[in-house]
């Protein structure tokens, strides 16, 4: 189960984009993920597939984590979908990365005990933060060359130290068991993730409507953040 890793943190392409952005704009010099100059038709099809996948996963995550929402944490499908579209675009993660991260997410949720809820850290209630950590883990597991925490900091807007802390917590909940037989992985994707899609009833090519509204996850430069869940 090999992921298609286009850009690594130390790649020439990544460094070239950073330098070009530094010289061309006074705003945040980092463009993550790096810009690609492919055909418009290819980009449109690729973006549509990623959007459809994000819809399926966001519905699944919200179905699991919505009961954990509170005054500070909103695990609605709409909020999760906005985050997924942005983080998948910036990280250039493959479908396998995203689906495996969703598998990890469900395992972590299933490991939660009702008696332990009061002792769990607040971030564990935020579906976006937990999925981000699962995405980091799946990216490390599937790719020989993976992003550093500094790169994930650029992608997410969270501090590298916070990401490391949350990653270790997720690893503990997974008992450090990241490997899964490929047949079992495909079976889970078909019987669990795709069935969740059917329950929600979202058409595969349904357009994503994004109402313009204020969101605490955006900073002054319109960079997606996950500071407040």
UniProtKB/Swiss-Prot annotation:
Job of this protein: Cyclin partner of the cyclin-dependent kinase (CDK) PHO85. Positively controls degradation of transcription factor GCN4 under favorable growth conditions. The PCL5-PHO85 cyclin-CDK holoenzyme phosphorylates GCN4, which is required for its degradation by the E3 ubiquitin ligase complex SCF(Cdc4). Amino acid starvation reduces PCL5-PHO85-associated GCN4 kinase activity and leads to stabilization of GCN4.
Single GO BP term: regulation of protein stability
UniProt family annotation: Belongs to the cyclin family. PCL1,2 subfamily.
A single GO cellular-component term on record: nucleus
Molecular function, one GO term: protein kinase binding
The name this protein goes by in its record: PHO85 cyclin-5
Cell cycle found in the keyword field: yes
Keywords carried by this UniProt record: Cell cycle, Cell division, Cyclin
Gene that encodes it: PCL5
Basic and acidic residues: bias regions: 1-24
Record CDD domains: CYCLIN_ScPCL1-like
Superkingdom of the organism of origin: Eukaryota
SUPFAM superfamilies: Cyclin-like
Induction comment from the UniProt entry of this chain: By transcription factor GCN4. Rapidly degraded under starvation conditions.
Oligomeric form and interacting partners: Forms a cyclin-CDK complex with PHO85.
Span list, region Disordered: 1-46
Keyword Oxidoreductase attributed: no
Organism: Saccharomyces cerevisiae (strain ATCC 204508 / S288c)
